[in-house]
Amino acid sequence: MIRFYLLIIVFLISLLSFLKAPEYHLWLLAVGVTEFPLIFFGISLLLTLTGFWAHKYQMAGTVLGVITMIIFLSPIVRAYWVSRTLRENMVNAFAGADGKEGPVLPASDTPFNFWNLFKIADTISYRTITYVKYTDTSMSLDFYPAQDQGAEFILPRPCVIVVHGGSWAGGDSRQLPELNSYLAFKGYNVAAINYRMAPKWQTPAPVEDIEAAISYLKNHSDELHIDIKNFVLLGRSAGAQIATLAAYTIHEPSIKGVIDFYGPEDMVWGYSIPSSRLIMDSRKVMEDYIGGTYSKVPQKYFACSPLEFVSRQSPPTLIIHGDNDVLVSPEHSRRLNLKLQQNGIKHYLLKLPWATHGFDYNLNGPGGQLSTFAVETFLKTVCAPTP
């Protein structure tokens, strides 16, 4: 009976592959279930095989175990389904962006590969640099130099500025660093920045920090081998709101594109439809960042809603969001997608049906592989590195 009860528990956990997590700790578990599926498949396999040859009363547990294993594998199956058309969709979406014909990808570049689930991401060393000093604080960035067969490039390369998440009040530049190393190995400089955070600092302080970071990187471009005409902003969650707001408002011609990982793009709508308090007190988070409730400072909510500043001059945009996100509703990305479409901006919304917030924690998981492919394809389009 213990085996049967354990299988029931594992079965209920497997449902996080399809259902939205109702509570914070279950959300964390959902990231593991969907992006490390083989681990949970292995657990259910062991439980299923235990007692498989025993008496007939074990059959119910065996059937439940088989069903559970199938559910745990579903993110992999769905990742293959999304990958079938991702390459073509990406190329078509960004063909002609910034005067380019679209990325030319070798046949070996596949959006999803089962065997990559077993890979461990390579890393490179970075150096920490102070990029701006204010009267009351200073901000730093972690710089990952573009690599050329294991050595730093000596020619100027594009630079990706990464803005971390953390509800505008937490996190730092060391968050999810695997993608930074991956992009550096692909020939892109990466600057993962720290920025001023709530509640001590409020919007638009982080956007000003991005401007300061771009200024610093331009001024030190010779030393860092940066192509000052090719910057791309990449943000996750709260960092995506900062990155897109900067891309759409500071009108910096060197910003060739912006990448939005599950960011809140409509702050007015987001405040009206808060997350479950069992997950996060999203209204309190927004009030700390913006400086008050919507009823008190409605103009500030409008002013920090990136989609309100989309225009025909906005840079190409890549949006990536999981349908099961319980921290930032995928409706934010759908709304931004519509606004970009209405303004004729080159863009693409990659929807991951099984994924939740933070799915890219595992770069080689189903969501991690697809999003990394999308990011690399986007970069090849909007700021192809100089050979």
Regions found by a protein language model. Give the residues of each.
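Hydrolase active-site cap/lid region
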Residues: 93-110, 244-299
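Short amphipathic alpha-helix adjacent to the substrate-entry channel of hydrolases
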Residues: 174-191
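N-terminal cap/lid segment of alpha/beta-hydrolase-fold proteins
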Residues: 17-42, 101-153
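Short beta-strand/loop motif that positions the catalytic acidic residue
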Residues: 313, 319-321, 325
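Alpha/beta-hydrolase active-site loop
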Residues: 202-222
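C-terminal catalytic histidine-bearing segment of alpha/beta-hydrolase fold enzymes
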Residues: 2, 10, 14-26, 320, ...
